[in-house]
């Protein structure tokens, strides 16, 4: 009987240890087509996208943890994930051109997913965005968005919920940027 308890205890400890150290990948980004339709209707000019900063994968914004489980970007860093999403959206509305005179520079200042709540998880993203045309600054602004999603005290529910919520955090940020009249004016023809 003692041996059985010892084996059960060891198995439980191993299961807890294994899930706490698991590495999860953020799901692929999916565009908000309503936001893209509105952006397309505003008739933006062509835009080049600079490398989103910080590129260092050891920077805090590129390292997310969901109750000890590392959330990794399929792009290598969350800055690259954001950059890829931005380029994909601009291509979708036929506004991306890597040699355009209008250029977007972005820096992620805050990037967090929290699954610590009992029933609700949260996401926070803050991005510094600069738009220049022919080396003249047209926009410099910091955007911040907050998201919430259903979660649970139980890690088996909360961790996958946090993982699934990351693309929505990026989508919410890009929606906020695309709907800003100052951004629309800065990238306009």
Enumerate the predicted regions with their spans.
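Short alpha-helical linear motifs
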Residues: 54-56, 125-130, 165-169
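Surface-exposed short loop/turn segments
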Residues: 22-34, 92-140, 144-160
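Short secondary-structure boundary motifs at beta->alpha junctions and helix caps
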Residues: 60-75, 136-179
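Extracytoplasmic/secreted envelope proteins and their assembly/folding machinery
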Residues: 79, 83, 87-90, 167-174
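A structural "domain/chain start" motif
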Residues: 21-80, 84, 182-189
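Sec-dependent bacterial lipoprotein signal peptides
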Residues: 1-21
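Sec-exported extracytoplasmic/periplasmic mature domains
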Residues: 87, 91-95, 113, 174-182
């Amino acid at each position: 009987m003692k041996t059985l308890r010892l084996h059960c205890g060891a198995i439980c400890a191993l299961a807890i240890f294994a899930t706490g150290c698991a590495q999860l990948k953020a799901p692929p980004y999916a565009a908000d087509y309503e936001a893209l339709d509105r952006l397309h209707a505003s008739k933006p000019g062509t835009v080049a996208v600079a490398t989103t900063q910080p590129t260092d994968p050891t920077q805090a914004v590129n390292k997310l943890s969901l109750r000890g489980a590392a959330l990794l970007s399929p792009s290598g860093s969350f800055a690259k994930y954001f950059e890829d999403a931005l380029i994909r959206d601009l291509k979708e509305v036929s506004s991306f051109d890597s040699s355009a005179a209008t250029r977007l520079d972005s820096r992620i200042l805050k990037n967090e997913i929290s699954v610590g709540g009992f029933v609700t998880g949260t996401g926070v993203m803050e991005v510094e965005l600069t738009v220049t045309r022919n080396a003249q600054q047209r926009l410099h602004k910091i955007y911040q968005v907050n998201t919430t999603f259903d979660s649970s005290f139980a890690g088996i529910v909360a961790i996958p919920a946090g993982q699934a919520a990351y693309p929505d955090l990026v989508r919410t940020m890009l929606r906020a940027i695309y709907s800003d009249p100052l951004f629309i004016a800065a990238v306009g023809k």
